Amino acid sequence: MANLGFPELVLIAVVILVLFGWKKLPDAARSVGRSMRIFKSEVSEMKNDGAEAEKTSAASTKTDEITSVSSTDTPQPTVTVESKDEKKHPA
């Protein structure tokens, strides 16, 4: 596909002209240009979102590590619940 010469390019141009015609060709080229611009902006937006997600995940990973270390160091409170029978008949 990389070896397109002048005759091949002329043939492609003729086929495009036959398919779209002289009148519709500028509109078709304009719509292709708009589509390419939208596609490029979406790709760059996805790259930016991916970079932000990496920064956020790296920060949350550090926070998770700190949280997990600190949660094992502190004693957990214990709660005891008395039943109704124990309240009526103390031992």
UniProtKB/Swiss-Prot annotation:
MF terms in GO: protein transmembrane transporter activity
Keyword Transmembrane annotated: yes
Biased composition (Polar residues): 57-81
Disordered: annotated span: 43-91
Domain of life: Bacteria
UniProt membrane topology term: Single-pass membrane protein
Gene Ontology CC: TAT protein transport complex
Broad class of the protein's primary localization: membrane
Pfam family for this entry, one: TatA_B_E
GO biological process: protein transport by the Tat complex
Positions with biased composition (Basic and acidic residues): 43-55, 82-91
UniProtKB keywords: Cell membrane, Membrane, Protein transport, Translocation, Transmembrane, Transmembrane helix, Transport
Location of this chain's protein in the cell: Cell membrane
Spans traversing the lipid bilayer: 2-22
Similarity annotation: Belongs to the TatA/E family.
Role description: Part of the twin-arginine translocation (Tat) system that transports large folded proteins containing a characteristic twin-arginine motif in their signal peptide across membranes. TatA could form the protein-conducting channel of the Tat system.
Known partners and oligomeric status: The Tat system comprises two distinct complexes: a TatABC complex, containing multiple copies of TatA, TatB and TatC subunits, and a separate TatA complex, containing only TatA subunits. Substrates initially bind to the TatABC complex, which probably triggers association of the separate TatA complex to form the active translocon.
NCBIfam families per record: PRK00575.1, tatAE
PANTHER family: SEC-INDEPENDENT PROTEIN TRANSLOCASE PROTEIN TATA (PTHR42982:SF8)
Designated name of the protein: Sec-independent protein translocase protein TatA
Organism placement in taxonomy: Bacteria, Bacillati, Actinomycetota, Actinomycetes, Mycobacteriales
